Amino acid sequence: MVITTTLCALALTLPLGEEEYYEIATIPIPDEIVLEVSAIEILEDGTALVATRRGDVFSVTGIWEDDVSSAQFNLYAQGLQEPLGLLSHEGWVYVMQRGELSRMRDTRGDGRMDELETICDLIPISGNYHEYSFGPAIGPDGNFWVTTNKPFGGEPFGRADWRGFTMSINDAGEMHPTCSGLRSPAGVESSPWGDVFYTDNQGEWCGASKLSIMKPGDFHGHPHGIASCKKEEWTYSVVENVPDGKLFPEVKLEIPELRLPAVWFPYDKMGRSPAGMAWDMTEGKFGPFAGQLFVTDQYDASVMRVALEQVNGNWQGACFPFRMGLQCGAI
């Protein structure tokens, strides 16, 4: 009796696991579809547009039902080049391809894209496999902000300008470099108040993955590509001679343009490759995290939670593990 009572008491006091509060519902994928999800955008009617690394976009319905096994996949677009971002905006779906910001829409109402326009194809690429492009997000200037990955390894067609940058693109397709020093900026998102934040992956010149706000003229720490800042398109101060082997706060004293991160993600304890993010705007419907930020991680197949605050004009915050156990990396 004593043993039974003790065990019952322990069962009542042990905290429940995260899976008891936030379930993961796996949507079955038709056998004929190779998904390799690279971007997701939820439309006003609840339909999910799902892009794939291979260049397809599917519209997925039925994902909000209690039983997601009835979800339907329909091909919306195909033939894109590595689309890594979708944004529904003013009747169009904007898509970030490897070297081009495009927009597309379905004008016939049959669920298939029938109109595709190039907004800007000025983003240089050298042919390196790692020259990904992410976004777009609407910036405080009303333009589309996109981020460009630096290359890793050979550059078959020579060094390309504006790699490791944030680019602001207006409706006319004009592109203006806005921030430098990015490494592998896999997530870019507009905040509810209009600023744009991005996530960067750990590696050389970036000791741990991070979350940072982006402001025009910022330098984010990686020296690759800063030679592009000597071109006339760069209208801010030029950063040169980035010191090696010093902590970020020390470098900030030497390079005032350096943007200190709002949050560092502890290596391995909080993944290694943060990517896409979303603010909780449900006003409590998703739990006690209203206004906080959720960040996915590609390496760790997880979702992290971030609480931010602004102190004396600077953003800082804390990060927490939120949900493990995804079946693949999330981007």
Model-based region annotation:
Residues 2-13:
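Sec-dependent N-terminal signal peptides
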Residues 12-331:
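Beta-propeller domains with acidic blade repeats across secreted/periplasmic ectodomains
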